[in-house]
Design a protein with these regions (language model features):
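Acidic donor-binding segment of Leloir-type glycosyltransferases
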Residues: 1-25
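Glycine-rich, basic loop-to-helix element that forms the pyrophosphate-binding segment
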Residues: 22-42, 64
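A conserved catalytic-core signature of glycosyltransferases
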Residues: 30, 116-124, 143
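Short aromatic/hydrophobic "clamp" motif used to bind/position activated sugar donors
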Residues: 47
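Acidic donor-binding/catalytic loop of UDP-sugar-dependent glycosyltransferases
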Residues: 52-67
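Catalytic donor/gating beta->alpha subdomain of glycosyltransferases that bind UDP-sugars
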Residues: 69, 75-100, 126-129, 133-197
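A recurrent flexible, glycine/aromatic-enriched loop bordering the glycosyltransferase active site
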Residues: 82, 104-122, 165-168, 194-200
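Membrane-embedded multi-pass helical conduit in multi-pass membrane proteins
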Residues: 205-281
Length: 283
C-alpha cells in the first residue's frame, strides 16, 4: 500500500504504526529486513507474522492465535491454506501446503519443532533478539519461518494452533513456474536443518520408494497379480485415510482423494528441483 494510505489508516486505527524507510537500504532478497524493522518498532512483547495477501478465518483470528501463549509457550505455529485456485495446479498447491503442515505440526507436537508457516506464526519479541534476529541468514531469500524457528523453538516452548478460527487463507496468485522457483529457494534453507529432522522428513519418500520397489519385485517374480493389486489398494486406502483426517482437521477439501497419485508426481518433482538447485549453485 502507498505510504499515504497507511498514514490515513493509522489515524483511524491508533494501533497501526507505520515504519517508513526513506532510503533503499534493503539490499537483501525476501522480506526478512522489513520484518526486522517492524519487530524492532513493535510496542508489545508478542509478534505475529502474516502474509500480506492472507485473509483471517474470522474476526477473532488474532485472539484465537494469541491464546496459545500460555504457561511456558513462546512460539505458536499457525496454519494458512490456499483459496481460489482452479485446475490441477490447485491440487498441487493444496497437497504441498497440506503435507508441509502435516510435517511441521506433527513434528512440533511430538517434541521436534523445526519450522512453521511464515504466513501465520507468532513468537515472543525477546526470542528474536536473543538469537540476533535474522542476521545470520540475511543472505538467504527465505528462513524467517524455518531457520529462525529452529534457533528459538524447543519441545517445551513451542505449540501448534489447530483452532479453525486461528487459520488464515491466501489467494495464491503465483504461476506454476514461480511456485517451482520458490520451492528451489526453500531448498537453500534445508541444509541448516538438524540431521535428525532431515532423517524424519525423508522417511515418507524412502518408504514410498521402497513400496514401489516392492511392487516391481512382485511383478518380476511373476507372483499372482492379485497380490500386487492388494498391496497397492492397502497402501492407497491407508494414505487416503491419513490425508482425510488431516484435511478434515485443517478444513481442506477433496485433496485426500488424489493424495496417492499426487505423491508420485512430487517424488519426480522433488528430484528435478534438487538437480535444478545444484545447477543454480554452480552458476
Amino acid at each position: 500500500l502507498p505510504i499515504y494510505v497507511l498514514k490515513a489508516f493509522s489515524k483511524l486505527y491508533p494501533c497501526l504504526k507505520v515504519v517508513n524507510i526513506v532510503e533503499n537500504v534493503n539490499k537483501f532478497r525476501g522480506r526478512k529486513f522489513p520484518i526486522s524493522l517492524g519487530i524492532k518498532s513493535a510496542k508489545y512483547d508478542h509478534i505475529v507474522l502474516a502474509g500480506a495477501d492472507c485473509v483471517p478465518s474470522g474476526f477473532e483470528w488474532l485472539k484465537n492465535l494469541a491464546r496459545n501463549f500460555s504457561g511456558k509457550k513462546e512460539v505458536v505455529l499457525g496454519f494458512c491454506t490456499y483459496t481460489k485456485q482452479k485446475g490441477l495446479f490447485k491440487f498441487l498447491l493444496q497437497y504441498d501446503n497440506l503435507t508441509t503442515a502435516m510435517n511441521y505440526m506433527g513434528l512440533a507436537l511430538s517434541g521436534h519443532p523445526y519450522r512453521g508457516d511464515g504466513r501465520n506464526i507468532a513468537f515472543k519479541k525477546d526470542l528474536f533478539f536473543k538469537v540476533g534476529g535474522f542476521t545470520k541468514h540475511y543472505n538467504l531469500p527465505l528462513g524467517e519461518d524455518d531457520i529462525f524457528i529452529r534457533n528459538v523453538s524447543t519441545a517445551s516452548n513451542t505449540t501448534v494452533s489447530l483452532t479453525p478460527e486461528s487459520f488464515l487463507s491466501s489467494d495464491a496468485k503465483h504461476t506454476y513456474k514461480e511456485w517451482k522457483r520458490q520451492k528451489i529457494d526453500r531448498l537453500s534453507t534445508y541444509k541448516y536443518y538438524k540431521p535428525s529432522i532431515k532423517f524424519l522428513l525423508s522417511i515418507p519418500n524412502i518408504t514410498t520408494l521402497l513400496f514401489y520397489a516392492f511392487v516391481i519385485t512382485l511383478l518380476l517374480l511373476s507372483l499372482p497379480f492379485e497380490y500386487v493389486i492388494l498391496a497397492i489398494v492397502i497402501k492407497f486406502v491407508l494414505q487416503i485415510l491419513i490425508y482425510f483426517k488431516s484435511c478434515k482437521r485443517l478444513g481442506i477439501k477433496r485433496v485426500f482423494i488424489f493424495a496417492p497419485l499426487i505423491e508420485l508426481y512430487f517424488l519426480l518433482l522433488n528430484a528435478e528441483l534438487r538437480l535444478l538447485s545444484l545447477f543454480r549453485k554452480k552458476k
